């Protein structure tokens, strides 16, 4: 027989009500905890760091799938051709844990492309600032670690502007005050080079492959590589030059053809002397190419491949 509390409520009914209340509180607590854990996992998934790499050895060769949709321009002129690559001219720059590359394009012709890679060049992301009306790429470099900057012709008037990105290429902004610090080929007169100290005349009417750093200016004219020496242009490699790079110490690397190399030869100019230092065997010297210093090593972008030399 059930015991009754004063007021007419059975004792076991009270305990049942308390049990139900405790159970409900427990369920609510568990639900809140589960939601908190789910929210933490979702937040963490958006903050996964991008992979980094080192230049300790050869960069992986991109597979056919990894290069789909990426620029792989090349020219196939007759042997001995020394013409400028034009819209197919290439640029390569090394940042902190990232590679940047680009193709020149041209106003009223093929558009340029700018890409970045976090895996030594195996895969690339297109970060071309098309929304800025980019029409031609004239220079590409890195600064402040992984960030990139460039000189590019923008807008309907194809005016050269200095642009920078601090967001891995997601956003590019013009920096008008930086343009005067750059060295680039004059868009109104290809035979002239614009420098921070004024314009200088190139050794030919159609120079290309221009690279400048720390006051050192090098370029390619009629297939030969030159460096500015006082008021004159001194030849570095006679014929077959394909790409140049200048490091912070003023050394110049030249990619070119040579009888000693079944591919693309690499020479280094320093302290007034040019020496052949490496050979990228199997690389096609007729392909458009770009060269970049990476510490003590060199990176060569030729065909679909970025390889490490030295």
Where are the regions that the model predicts?
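Extracytoplasmic low-complexity, Pro/Thr/Ser/Ala/Gly-rich segments
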Residues: 34-135
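Intrinsically disordered, low-complexity segments enriched in Gly and acidic/Ser/Thr residues
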Residues: 220-286
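Repeated scaffold domains used in trafficking and secretory/extracellular systems
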Residues: 84-94, 132-143, 176-188, 204-214, ...
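Conserved Ser/Thr-centered positions that define the repeating blades of beta-propeller domains
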Residues: 117-118, 163-166, 227-228, 265-269, ...
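Short glycine/acidic-enriched loop and turn motifs that connect beta-strands
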Residues: 99, 104-109, 153-158, 224-226, ...
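Hydrophobic single-pass membrane-targeting/anchoring helices
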Residues: 4-45
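Entry beta-strands of beta-propeller and related beta-repeat scaffolds
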Residues: 96-101, 144-151, 215-217, 250-253, ...
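Blade-level signature of beta-propeller repeat domains, shared across WD40, Kelch, NHL, RCC1
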Residues: 290-310
